[in-house]
Amino acid sequence: MVSAEHAEKFGRLVIQDYSGRMKPVNTFSSELLRKVSKSDTFEGFTSDQVLISMNQFPEFWYQIPIIHLVKGNDSIRKIIGVDKEAKYAPLISFFDDFGNYKLQKQTDEAYKEVVPNKFQKDFIEADKKVNLLYSAISGQILRFFPLPKDTNNKWASYLELQHPTKTNLDTVKNIIPFYFGEAVRASQSKDYKNAESLLTGLSKFQREFGGKVMLSEDKLEAEIQYNKYDVFKKL
């Protein structure tokens, strides 16, 4: 894991979520842990540290029991193949050996209901946790990059920029894999100079091309402080 101090700097980057809301990475990482694991930290690590690690070592995080399972619904546990007393399950347990989603039938039926019952609500909640965790581990949700001259002020993730755009994004997007690789080395050497330089470069790009939707420094700081207060309040 990278240090908490360095992870905090990563948490100050801005992303655009699927609804178009602009938020600090720290807000997303906090929401991720709270919604998926029902906790503000994971084994003593901050949410920002965890999110960085997920993108460095996705295969590892597929195996980690981090998805909180609701009490009383043994059907979910039976379908995904975990112990009936298990409080948490790994993402991989929700898929079979061929990559098929084990809860597909139950969630399809649950989402069709206008007023789902408690049993169906449990499946919907589990499905949302699975999708949220997958979006984090895959990097799909990390929409760091404002699209130059986009009339809708859309931002994109590294995964969404695999085809040439004939803009400076074709170069800038590579900051993401470079950063996660550099952060691995930094966590071992304790020298975060290069990793922080990449974060600074990406932050400058966001401010230069983020347009009207980019968070101001005041709003960014206020939201991060609120996240810290919310965690402290629960201690």
Predicted regions and their residues:
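Soluble extramembrane regions of membrane proteins in the secretory/endomembrane system
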Residues: 1-223
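Core alpha-helical transmembrane segments of integral membrane proteins
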Residues: 217-235
